[in-house]
From Swiss-Prot:
The protein's name in its UniProt record: Lon protease 1
The EC number(s) this enzyme carries: 3.4.21.53
GO biological process, one term: protein quality control for misfolded or incompletely synthesized proteins
SMART domains for the chain: AAA, LON
Lineage: Bacteria, Pseudomonadati, Myxococcota, Myxococcia, Myxococcales
């Protein structure tokens, strides 16, 4: 019997009339015991009525239903959910303030069928909801799943006691399991009401399963957040604790005082240092930040380094120029022999500086082969002008940051090499040597040559901005001197900012003078022979120059002289100290087998072999060109690792020769029945340029006419299809190379006649230099002809024809052997 009735089903049909207790923010489920505090008069009256009309089992029955809105103080039937829980009033305790504390137990779900009129409290007729008790395999699986999820939920939710897990594990009834679990979940009121109104235990468990899964996900995120926050708090607390300890230790050791002293020292330096206004403000700002930092923090170290760099730079510190032009000239001549042009330019600068007082530093570029004294001349210029000297090697530099520095945001950032060098010099007007400017390259880190555009521009470099300093620095007083072996690798805009001064190779008399004045005393001292009298004769020096070196400069000559002195040093230790005279034979004995042959490029006059002249970054060179013919189908073969321009020159020369075949006495059938091969020896070395045009043309004419070429003639020049000889570059270097090789006659383009003044007078007197305007002029000078004046002037059929053999035919055009 339920609530004292004889038949439960009959009671459900008839309905049950009970008082209703509206609840705020709480829903009571069956099997749930809840304490409630009741203060509203209607609610207290409902409880008193339930206690006054107990059933036969002596239990007070009341319907526990939730309000839709908790804020409603005087709810109407529409403000209350019409689905609640029938419960027993276990205990009722009036309180002194007029409220009532009541303990209720939920028993069964019930629906409100009807509200009875009653002003004192709500009296309702309810219909009990029967729980489904049939068990299935699916329901059993659902029960187990809910048990498992609830276990995971309890482990994450610290608000539910672990004992609750054991209590729930003992419940097998699906309906009771769902009601027991939901009572301990922190769900929204509407979610709990929905579960209360779900009559099917299976659906209730499914819904509960979904809700718990969602709660578990939220709890897992909360756990991660709590763990992260806890770790952060522990770290912060640890750092705080350690910092406090550190400060205490520093206080004991006096380090904090040392940090304060360091800041005071920086402030003192700032007062005494002349800097730009921008730099002064920047240092003050950084100093303010430094005071707020811990002395041991990484950021404090970065700020300290930055301030040190700014203060240590020579913003207005400069050396006074030695403006005495005569004294400066004496210093330059003491250090270097020759080099007239660069010396004149420096003396001109000093003269103008003496008159104008304020003059921007020049930007010079010394271009010449290795060993001619470009770098040492820059050092000598610094000595002559009384300035500090700094050198920056640009060979292999491919990172823009090497010039402009790294931004301070990077770890280990530093200023660029320019600023570092100026700090090292301690002066804002040094002689700054940018060595090997043609050896820079470019990659993904930027183009250093583009960064130098601002540095070497007198109109811009007074506001040079280094990335690290982020301040404008004045470079306009610096005398920049660049060095390069060739101009080809220097970008055009950068060339435009420099005053190029070409330094050609040394002549033999100049090398002799340099050896006597500088190299011999230097090597004698370097090898510990200063107290001995060692005399190296001129023939010995000439032998070293001719047979052991072949260069434009004197670097190899210095090495060979050093080798002679090392042999002498060994001989002195072995045989005792004595004065030594080194003659030609002794020099050759000391240095071993000669490396080079001096004299004519060729031992005798030959067919198809011409001595040409080339200009490389190492200076002037002798370039032999060979041509020969063989039976074939008229192909032109070109070998010797030639560049595209030189190959085109060979093709142009061939076209010119074919166009004048009759005048040269060449049978046209030769071009159909013979292949022509042009080769430039030393095939491993790349060669390019148009200036070998006349050389190739002469070799072709000689090979096709079987006329010998004079071995004492060298030539250079570009040719056109009309036979004109065009001007070339590097005439001085090429002429010096011819002189070194013992050549007697040099053929040059007539348009280069104006450049002869650059060639030393002694060399011009020792050479026969012939300006030529047409290829015919070249051939008349180079070929061994009986009547040179008539060659090529009119068609001829005499001699020179080939009849299927490459042997030299007897011909009136060929000089007798």
């Amino acid at each position: 019997m339920f609530f004292g009735r004889d038949d439960k089903k009959e009671a459900q049909k008839r309905g049950l009339t009970v008082p209703l207790l509206p609840l705020r923010d709480i829903i009571v489920f069956p099997h749930m015991v809840v304490p409630l505090f009741v203060g509203r008069e209607k609610s207290i009256a409902a409880l008193k009525d339930a206690m006054a009309h107990k059933g036969p089992d002596d239990k007070a029955v009341i319907l526990l239903a939730a309000q839709k809105k908790a804020k409603t103080n005087d709810p109407t039937p529409d403000d209350i959910f019409h689905f609640g829980t029938l419960g027993h009033v276990i205990q009722l305790l009036p309180l002194p303030d007029g409220t009532v504390k009541v303990l209720v137990e939920g028993v069964r779900r019930a629906k409100v069928k009807k509200f009875h009129p009653n002003d004192a409290f709500f009296m309702v007729e309810v219909e009990e909801v029967e729980e489904q008790t049939e068990k299935t395999v699916e329901l059993e699986a659902l029960v187990r799943s809910v048990h498992s999820v609830f276990e995971a939920f309890v482990k994450l939710n610290k608000r539910i006691p672990p004992e609750m897990l054991m209590q729930v594990a003992s419940i097998d009834d699906p309906a009771r399991l769902a009601d027991t679990i939901v009572a301990h979940l922190s769900l929204k009121l509407n979610d709990k009401q929905a579960l209360l109104e779900t009559e099917s235990p299976a659906k209730r468990l499914e819904k509960l399963y979904e809700l718990m899964q969602g709660e578990i996900e939220i709890l897992q995120v909360e756990k991660k957040i709590r763990t992260r926050v806890k770790k952060q708090m522990e770290k912060t607390q640890k750092e705080y604790y350690l910092n406090e300890q550190m400060q205490a230790i520093q206080k004991e050791l006096g380090e904090r005082d040392e940090f304060k002293n360091e800041i005071q020292e920086i402030e003192e330096k700032l007062k005494n240092k002349r800097m730009s206004k921008e730099a002064t403000l920047k240092v003050k700002k950084e100093l303010k930040k430094l005071r707020m930092m811990s002395p041991m923090s990484a950021e404090a170290t970065v700020v300290r380094n930055y301030i040190d760099w700014i203060i240590s730079l020579p913003w207005y510190d400069e050396t006074q120029d030695r403006l005495d032009v005569t004294e400066a000239e004496t210093v330059l001549n003491e250090d270097h022999y020759g080099l007239k042009k660069p010396k004149e330019r420096i003396l001109e600068y000093l003269a103008v500086q003496q008159l104008v007082k304020k003059l921007k530093g020049p930007v010079l570029c010394f271009v010449g082969p290795p060993g001619v004294g470009k770098t040492s001349l820059a050092r000598s210029i610094a000595r002559a002008t009384g300035r500090k000297f700094v050198r920056l090697s640009l060979g292999g530099v491919r990172d823009e940051a090497e010039i402009r520095g790294h931004r301070r945001t990077y770890i280990g950032a530093m200023p660029g090499k320019l600023i570092q060098s100026l700090k090292k010099a301690g002066s804002n007007n040094p002689v700054f040597l940018l060595d090997e400017i043609d050896k820079m390259s470019t990659d993904f880190r930027g183009d250093p040559s583009a960064a130098l555009l601002e540095v070497l521009d007198p109109e811009q470099n007074h506001t040079f901005n280094d990335h690290y300093l982020d301040l404008d620095y004045d470079l306009s007083k610096v005398m920049f001197i660049c060095t390069a072996n060739t101009m080809h690798n220097i970008p055009g805009p950068l060339q435009d900012r420099m005053e190029v001064i070409r330094i050609a190779g040394y002549t033999e008399p100049e090398k002799l003078s340099i050896a006597r004045r500088y190299l011999i005393p230097k090597e004698q001292e370097a090898n510990g022979l200063s107290d001995l009298k060692v005399d190296i004769s001129d023939p010995a020096l000439r032998t070293i120059i001719h047979r052991y070196t072949r260069e434009s400069g004197v670097r190899s000559l210095e090495r060979e002289i050093g080798g002679v002195f090392r042999k002498i040093a060994r001989d002195v230790l072995k045989n005792g100290k004595r004065d030594i005279d080194v003659d030609r034979k002794m020099a050759m004995k000391f240095l071993g087998t000669p490396r080079y042959r001096y004299g004519m490029a060729e031992a005798e006059d030959q067919v198809g072999i011409v001595t040409g002249l080339a200009w490389t970054e190492l200076g002037g060179e002798i370039l032999t060109t060979e041509a020969t013919i063989m039976p074939g189908k008229g192909k032109l073969i070109i070998t010797g690792k030639l560049g595209e321009v030189m190959q085109e020159s060979a093709q142009a020369a061939m076209s010119y020769v074919r166009s004048r075949a009759e005048r040269f006495g060449i049978d046209r059938k030769v071009f159909e029945n013979y292949d022509i091969h042009v080769h430039l020896p030393e095939g491993a070395i790349p060669k390019d340029g148009p200036s070998a045009g006349v050389t190739i043309c002469t070799a072709l004419v000689s090979a096709l006419t079987r006329v010998l070429i004079r071995r004492d003639v060298a030539m250079t020049g570009e040719i056109t299809l009309r036979g004109r000889v065009l001007p070339i570059g590097g005439l001085k270097e090429k002429t010096l190379a011819a002189h070194r090789a013992g050549i007697k006659t040099v053929l040059i383009p007539k348009a280069n006649k104006k450049d002869l003044k650059d060639i030393p007078l002694k060399i011009r007197k020792q050479l026969r230099i012939v300006p030529v305007e047409f290829v015919d002029d070249v051939l008349r000078e180079a070929l061994v002809l009986e009547k040179p004046e008539e060659f090529g002037r009119k068609p001829t059929t005499d001699g020179g024809k080939l009849g299927g053999t490459t042997e030299l035919p007897a011909s009136p055009a060929v000089a007798p052997a």
